[in-house]
Design a protein with these regions (language model features):
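Alpha-helical linker/edge segments of TPR/alpha-solenoid repeat scaffolds
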Residues: 92-95, 128-131, 159-172
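N-terminal alpha-helical interaction modules that lie
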Residues: 1-67, 71-73, 89, 169-172
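Alpha-helical adaptor scaffolds
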Residues: 47-56, 67-115
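"A position-specific structural signal for the A-helix of alpha-solenoid helical repeats
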Residues: 48, 82, 119, 126, ...
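A conserved position within tetratricopeptide repeats
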Residues: 37, 70, 104-107, 141, ...
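Structural signature of alpha-solenoid helical repeat junctions
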Residues: 41, 75, 112, 152-156
Length: 172
């Protein structure tokens, strides 16, 4: 059963052209290969290529790119998030959750807490810990609303929370 109907136009933005978040799986997915390829060709940010390779399911290549990028910018939160996402995509879900919990401890009370909670929710959802995913998504949404975040981020958190609650209700 599709959570949102009507094609991909209602899917939340994933933060890169041509990529949106599948509202059923809550995983980023390429929805327009041409747009994605053009944006990637124009980008000079190594994080963009890492993200696209992750979305494509190429975790090993993403990990190699990440190692080089982290060497040049070891404290980058975005790159540390990619490290945990690589673990998630590689089905090392417990390790991904542990790393996101560590990042959460480091970002609690900062503007970055919401993005970490959103990613933590995604890892919980992927691991089947739906109750924890609901909690993480709810807190991410609360923080984004309280912080007057971009509407696209609030929408992404709303869709993720609704989907996680729906799945939780199915399993209850």
């Amino acid at each position: 059963m599709d959570f949102l109907t009507g094609g991909t136009s209602d899917w939340p933005d994933a933060g890169f052209p041509g990529i949106k978040i599948n509202p059923d799986s809550l995983v980023p997915q390429i929805v327009n290969e041409e747009t994605c390829a053009q944006a990637l060709a124009a980008s000079t940010d190594p994080g963009d290529l890492i993200f696209v390779r992750l979305v494509e399911g190429h975790a090993a290549e993403a990990a190699e790119l990440l190692a080089e990028a982290r060497y040049n910018d070891p404290s980058s939160l975005r790159l540390r998030i990619f490290e945990a996402d690589i673990l998630r995509v590689s089905n090392r879900l417990d390790r991904a959750v542990d790393l996101f919990r560590q990042l959460l401890a480091e970002t609690r009370g900062t503007p970055d807490e919401a993005v970490i909670r959103q990613h933590l929710g995604q890892s919980y959802f992927a691991s089947g810990n739906i109750a924890a995913a609901v909690e993480a998504y709810a807190k991410a949404l609360d923080l984004r609303v309280a912080g007057s975040a971009d509407a696209a981020l609030i929408y992404a958190s709303t869709v993720a929370l609704q989907r996680a609650r729906y799945v939780l209700d199915l399993t209850s």
